[in-house]
């Protein structure tokens, strides 16, 4: 800023008259005059006017001189060394430069921060950080030095008093003292003087600062301890960090700390050795004999002395040398010690800081004390713990002054140590005296305030309750459009209160107070204002549990009467909601940005596809399916009806379709005939294709189309580009209406209709296919409109159909008794064989069970054949609206075999069906399964929720951060086969991914797809047609990004069908995609009503957990460790058969594998085997597979096994989601040899850190470190996260904070969780962009512009 601008008169700055007067009186006429004063002088001269002048001082960087800013000499010296001449330079300096300069002097930096706070200035963050938090470079944690704790403090707490029980005012120097922590009432001191002036003035009488009461939430105090105290975290947590550091056994160290034993510091004339631990008796004897000629200490003092005497550098050298000389067992303990010593040496921590002379006192706002009725107080338990410390500390002080006996003082010191232990972590200190008297449980210590679901991290930082929210029961809103929801007026009037007040102020030109008065009257003006403000203002609806991102979506509110929220029936599958009493929460996005995001990204009509597999998630269900099924039924006139009242019903049917084969000019003529009861919805009629606005071939347009009125009505909702849908086939949907349905002029229509088979009606599956096809061709908005049409048709025609269920619909299977007699005869035969000794009990049981299974299947088949096409129950099942074949078999056939409580099949089946009624014994055996279903549901829902939580935690920092990482590696995929069946096709696996190399036609050599080109559906079809079986694709598993992943390796975002955008939080989406069906799998168990079935969920979820947690599998399979040939399989010794394999390169070398008895062998003699191939049935141990076959094979195995579990339950999840989880399981490496790096052999570090260490060695031409990949379970992977905040908020909070504090760990805030915890924007979506991208070059501002800006502030 040029100097001449400082000669601007203060009168041009539009300041208030009293302020201008004060400036004039102080001799300040121009901006330059401010430079003649220090900040403190300006504050005293201007008093309350200082706050009005402050923005001007900031804009013009005044006072200019650094000496005038009330900074200490130390601060000014550091700033001068950085080349800063004045205040303007300081304001333009980046935060990174300042933090680096003040790294060794945090107290001086605090002073600088106070200055920035006063000026409301935040130094800009360096933009060399490519990714992560916008506002902060990093978050660091370390041990606090005693001086720092005193520096944080605003005063020493010396009294254990809290609040005066008569006046309810805090006691002086007590735990709630106003002098230390700030006033209880805004700008009012302890002697009740009020002063609404500028901050930072103190009452002359009581010494309390006149300031806001909110400072009581941030100001800390301290307690000066009379004796040093060991921090319990470093002593009592396992493994004890102090014991490892000092190389003393934990038990012995505890004895020293709790004053049981002594440690020799200086042996003097005694026979003791330094660091030798001696008992009380030995100490007394030595003291008696040698007096002060030797030094032995006990308690924390002794530990502090030992730590101070520790020479870190020397110890490191000695330990590193002894590493190579010792046995494996000793090496492990040396590495543990070395790790801790290195941590202290490399960080700015000192080991003696683990022993405390002073402890901080939490601000009283965070540990309140509230008076209750009847003179009692409700208080936070931490207050009791502080009181106990103060009591004991004061007592110790008194005893020391009185020179009490050594034993008494020692006992008091031990009690003080225990009191401080209880404050920091009371869970580990299970002493009776630290219990809550009323509830007899340990008091809640500071550690408990952080730990677990109710702790600070998970309860208050990662999830908060929000204002402008409501909750109500949901009911169906069939009249709503796709993007709407019905909000009760009573709720909306409160939810939209701020917007209504603003509207009232605008329309009536009144102030806030008057607007509030009108609002409280709730008259017509207010309701009219509400109608205005809800227009175009989306709201968010959420149903718990929110299993995936579709569990919270945006809607346009439509005001309704009543008290229930109305929900569009098509969105229920996404929320997994039904209308049997479910409740939903509603939230109002307040800012314009939030409203824009809700409308563009979260609106229901924009979220039609499921992120886990790209299939439509808004499929019609129940009544809607049934209505459309009924609408598209096609019936022949000459059909004969067999069941009850056959003759009459056949006659009615023929009369209904008496005009079959009639010709109509257009749909309206057909509708008129229907209204006049000339034809039925299902009657087969002819119509000219020209009358229908859909796609036909030229040849078809010359003929007549055979269809029904129902199908004409259904096709009316399709766009002109679609073919006319006359049958539920893929050909009709994708290509054209089949020519078979067209009648050439001159053909006999009756003959034509006789030969023509009737196509099936449109069921749920086909409706989904139509929606998917529609979505590919049209925009999202068009799709949502079409879905609304399907819904309206469905409800209308299911009402017209009037489909009901009656007893008459359920007819028992006619051949049932004969079949039962046959199977019973066969079972008698099996029993005879067993009695004659031809069968073992297990074989007999297996045969009997198979007989009953087969007979149930036979009855099921026969029953389905006997069902009439117009049977209402059959229609419900066939359409996919409700119920399955199994349900009908139980209703009308036989219930079949049941499971007992252990999950084994009971041999005696339930022969009756529900229609016939069950015997008491049959009913009893049915109850086991039903109960198991209910308990399974409850248990597995929790289990699945926990799995989702772990998955989210392990992947939360995976975000798409760049377009391409230029990886040259690929992942070869092929169709997934399980038990001879294809479970995931090659097309499904490659669609929406990028090719990692050129793919050519095997015969013609023509290029099908180039490297790094997207494989679309048509390209994927070309690859399949070319009979290519294996395709190399770009994969997340081979991504080169240091943090997050790149768009090319991820491919298409399944929720939008477009290439994934930078900033998409793909990690969380992957975790939700795998976790959400996990809950569905568990919940589906009870739908079969406990009927014995092979695919019960119990295999599902535990298996997924076993894979993701890398546990040893139960039925472990044996795998080959080499490439070779099976020489022989020796089964002679039936106890333990063995397989002999010879090596491929050396046929004379044999490897023998001894098998468990009775295992299924999967290989035969002379078979070739490769490393990692299964030799016996069972599950492979992942760690073994990784060791034998390498990373790629292990990754491939996990991917396939997870897919098998989900496909068995008919859930399809895209590979890319599972790949993200696997990517996180392989992110660490085990150091085998450290080379010249500072790494320690035997430790596990992330691949990124390993690469960095080796790159450094390459540059310096030194020896590289060697490591091998390891596989981590998702829980361990989460806990090993680079982010200490993310790991600490997941599990084992104290353990992670202990290690992080010792190492002085830095969290670079790359993940989502850590940014949520510190209250910043998450580095995903719009938050991923660098601040530099939002900055535009500006013209230098003129003085008048700056003055204007100041006035606005």
From Swiss-Prot:
GO biological process: one example: DNA-templated transcription
EC number: 2.7.7.6
Keywords tagged on the record: DNA-directed RNA polymerase, Magnesium, Metal-binding, Nucleotidyltransferase, Transcription, Transferase, Zinc
Cofactor note: Binds 1 Mg(2+) ion per subunit.
Reaction catalyzed: RNA(n) + a ribonucleoside 5'-triphosphate = RNA(n+1) + diphosphate
Entry cofactors: Mg(2+); Zn(2+)
Region spans: Unknown: 1-117
UniProt: Mg(2+) binding residues: 578, 580, 582
Positions of region (DNA-directed RNA polymerase subunit beta'): 118-1353
MF (Gene Ontology): DNA binding; DNA-directed RNA polymerase activity; magnesium ion binding; zinc ion binding
Family annotation (InterPro entries): DNA-dir_RpoC_beta_prime, DNA-dir_RpoC_beta_prime_bact, RNA_pol_asu, RNA_pol_N, RNA_pol_Rpb1_1, RNA_pol_Rpb1_3, RNA_pol_Rpb1_3_sf, RNA_pol_Rpb1_4
Binding, Zn(2+): 189, 191, 203, 206
Enzyme class (EC, first level): transferase
Recorded family membership: Belongs to the RNA polymerase beta' chain family.
Entry function: DNA-dependent RNA polymerase catalyzes the transcription of DNA into RNA using the four ribonucleoside triphosphates as substrates.
NCBIfam families: rpoC_TIGR (TIGR02386)
PANTHER family: DNA-DIRECTED RNA POLYMERASE, DNA-DIRECTED RNA POLYMERASE SUBUNIT BETA
Subunit relationships: The RNAP catalytic core consists of 2 alpha, 1 beta, 1 beta' and 1 omega subunit. When a sigma factor is associated with the core the holoenzyme is formed, which can initiate transcription.
Protein name per the record: DNA-directed RNA polymerase subunit beta'
Gene name per UniProt: rpoC
